[in-house]
């Protein structure tokens, strides 16, 4: 029991350190992407950090299996290189204790991965989409962009701003496209103004030095009015989420849907959970190194095996979403194949495997004697 606690402690310390490093790498990559989208006007600037925070669960989907996989490789590899595991085996401790430690750590990590993949990530993705759509439908001064036409109030009002300086909008053009009650279509111009958000979510555009031209091209009775200060009520536009991405759907919604994309997404989420114990089991035999080789001797082939697993699953998910392949059949087969690989690798030095290896080597030598 003391030995198990020691090994778990060592793996856990490595896992936390690797998780922080991966978090920094993924966060920096996501920050550059969101910042670029904000610079292009695709994402409101004041939502950058909110979107980054909501993007953390999605980033954690791939980080959780990877950090445990690398932690087991590095920790057990160091113990092999320093001959600690050799001493353990000399005292009668075999491969089972390493597998047991890997399973304990993988079950704890898989629990977090399950909560993240099945509930937290879909909620965060849906929240991201709703925030962006709502900000586009009901812009504030912080998210307004100069030189762009902005539709508000269910496309009845179009706003154009020439400049934004010191939280003030300059050279404002407000187009009321459709008649409202006794009011004809109009164009409002102003030197400057500000957008005020009311507590109930409605918005009021406060304009100064304003001129309003009201009328239609069909009738010559145009009305021109000058205002020192003009308040335009923009109201609140409910954002309609037309995005049908299955990544936003909850677990119950995915199960109820019968589409190929929903099935592929469901099996992808299951894969993100099963990948934790599968990769942990595979990491145990791959961490075994000769003390002269160093602890990093098998890092590259282990990472290649990890990449092959996720590339296969990602390819089957994409093809399944497009309806080209049956993801619900192929993705579980990959999991079964890697599970069998983990069993074979972990039992390679067992008595049963020794018998099989001896049997095949004996057959091979017999063939060599028969055909010299």
Curated annotation (Swiss-Prot):
Any one GO BP annotation for this protein: transmembrane transport
Subunit structure: Component of the lipopolysaccharide transport and assembly complex. The LptBFG transporter is composed of two ATP-binding proteins (LptB) and two transmembrane proteins (LptF and LptG).
Its biological purpose: Part of the ABC transporter complex LptBFG involved in the translocation of lipopolysaccharide (LPS) from the inner membrane to the outer membrane.
Superkingdom of origin organism: Bacteria
Main location: membrane
Any single Gene Ontology cellular-component annotation: ATP-binding cassette (ABC) transporter complex
Name of the gene: lptF
Subcellular localization(s) per the UniProt record: Cell inner membrane
Keyword annotations from UniProtKB, A to Z: Cell inner membrane, Cell membrane, Membrane, Transmembrane, Transmembrane helix, Transport
Organism: Haemophilus influenzae (strain ATCC 51907 / DSM 11121 / KW20 / Rd)
Transmembrane segments: 16-36, 54-74, 101-121, 266-286, 296-316, 325-345
Disulfide bonds: none
Pfam families cross-referenced by the UniProt entry: LptF_LptG
Family: Belongs to the LptF/LptG family.
NCBIfam families: LptF_YjgP
Protein's membrane topology: Multi-pass membrane protein
InterPro entries xref list: LptF, LptG/LptF_permease
This protein's name: Lipopolysaccharide export system permease protein LptF
PANTHER family: LIPOPOLYSACCHARIDE EXPORT SYSTEM PERMEASE PROTEIN LPTF, SLR0882 PROTEIN-RELATED
């Amino acid at each position: 029991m003391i030995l198990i606690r020691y090994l778990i402690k060592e793996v856990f310390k490595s896992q936390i350190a690797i998780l922080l490093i991966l978090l920094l790498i993924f966060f920096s990559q996501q920050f550059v992407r969101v910042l670029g989208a904000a610079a292009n006007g695709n994402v409101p600037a004041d939502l950058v950090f909110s979107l980054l925070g909501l993007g953390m669960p999605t980033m954690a989907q791939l980080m959780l299996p990877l950090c445990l996989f690398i932690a087991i490789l590095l920790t057990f590899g160091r113990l092999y290189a320093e001959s600690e595991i050799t001493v353990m085996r000399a005292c009668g401790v075999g491969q089972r204790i390493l597998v047991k430690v890997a399973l304990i750590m993988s079950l704890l990590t898989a629990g977090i991965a399950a909560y993240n993949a099945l509930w937290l990530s879909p909620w965060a993705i849906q929240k991201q989409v709703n925030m962006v759509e709502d900000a586009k439908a009901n812009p504030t001064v912080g998210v307004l962009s100069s030189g762009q036409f902005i539709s508000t109030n269910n496309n009845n009002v179009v706003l154009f701003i020439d400049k934004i300086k010191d939280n003030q909008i300059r050279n404002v053009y407000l187009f009321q496209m459709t008649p409202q009650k006794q009011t004809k279509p109009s164009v409002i111009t102003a030197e400057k103004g500000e957008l005020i958000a009311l507590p109930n979510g409605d918005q009021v555009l406060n304009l100064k030095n304003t001129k309003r031209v009201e009328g239609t091209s069909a009738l010559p009775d145009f009305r021109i009015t000058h205002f020192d200060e003009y308040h335009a009520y923009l109201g609140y536009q409910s954002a309609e989420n037309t995005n049908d991405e299955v990544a936003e759907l909850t677990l119950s919604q995915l199960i109820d849907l019968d589409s190929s994309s929903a099935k592929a997404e469901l099996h992808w989420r299951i894969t993100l959970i099963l990948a934790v114990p599968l990769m942990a089991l595979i990491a145990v035999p791959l961490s075994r190194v000769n003390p002269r080789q160093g602890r990093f001797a098998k890092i590259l082939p282990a990472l290649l095996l990890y990449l092959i697993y996720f590339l296969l699953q990602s390819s089957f998910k994409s093809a399944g979403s497009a309806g080209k392949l049956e993801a619900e059949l192929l993705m579980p087969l990959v999991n079964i194949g890697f599970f069998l690989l983990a069993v074979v690798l972990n039992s390679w030095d067992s008595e049963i495997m020794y018998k099989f290896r001896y049997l095949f080597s004996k057959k091979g030598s017999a063939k060599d004697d028969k055909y010299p």
